[in-house]
Amino acid sequence: VANGAVPCSKVTGKWLFPRAALDRWIEAGMAKPHGFVAHDAPPIVGGSHDPLLEWALRRSGSGLALLSVGSEAGLAKLAANEVAIAAIHMHALDNDDANLTAVAAAQHLHDAVVIAFARREEGLLVAPGNPLALSSLTDATKAKARFAARQSGAGAQLLLAKLMAADSSSIERLNLLPSTFMTGDDLAFAIRADEADCGIATRAAANAHGLDFVSLAWEHFDLAMRRRTYFEPGVQALLALMRSPEFHRHAELLGGFDTGAAGTVRLTR
């Protein structure tokens, strides 16, 4: 009102707000509280790649595309309204639920909800037979194993940093390959091609590529979205599948998933 942005007039000391003009002003998106987004995000799930999620998006007929850019980038795109959903598995030292912490702290996400997708088993992918006899990250460091790393901000890379810090070590002590890999599948291909000795990804990725697996941790893999997105038909189709026996059977087939809490609300803002 003070700067003239709101359509109104002052008559005999009283402010008058013309209904039609005010409605047009609101519809134009000029009245937005901090973090409010006036337009719908594109039907994209951005963030971490996951084979169970990829299958579920197709099988449910959700109409949602998958953009694999890593957990941190996915959450940033959600906040910027560039994706409808962020698929995330965050990690931080001394924080066993970094997903919820990250969403709660995110700017421009005052209306967020976090839905459990699955718990996943993460660990070291190694060549068949585990030729270097690796059983830990310490072994990988000592053996100077060629370590395939993920891009900065990827959940697997955050987990690697957390595990190394918990062991009073750092990623820099590993024999890292010069290039990084965008997905667990890319990392697995590098190991199959003998371009790398090991790297962190899911048990499902190891199973899919015929690799051996050294378990290191279980993690929450969640879907973050705005509350209004939750009620979209495509999202409801996905959630319906996540609650079905077929979803749980497919998770068992892939391996390394716990889908007992799939579809439950873990956080609302």
What are these regions (language model features)?
Residues 39-48, 138-158:
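Short loop->beta-strand "edge-of-pocket" segments that line small-molecule binding or catalytic clefts
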Residues 64-70, 171-186:
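Short beta-strand-to-loop elements that line the ligand-binding cleft
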Residues 72-86, 91, 180-195:
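Short helices/loops that flank or line small-molecule/ion binding pockets
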Residues 90-104, 188-217:
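A ligand-binding cleft/hinge motif common to bilobed small-molecule-binding domains
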Residues 117, 126-147:
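Flexible hinge/capping segments at coil-to-helix
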Residues 128-135, 169, 228-234:
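Short helix-loop capping/hinge motifs at secondary-structure junctions, enriched
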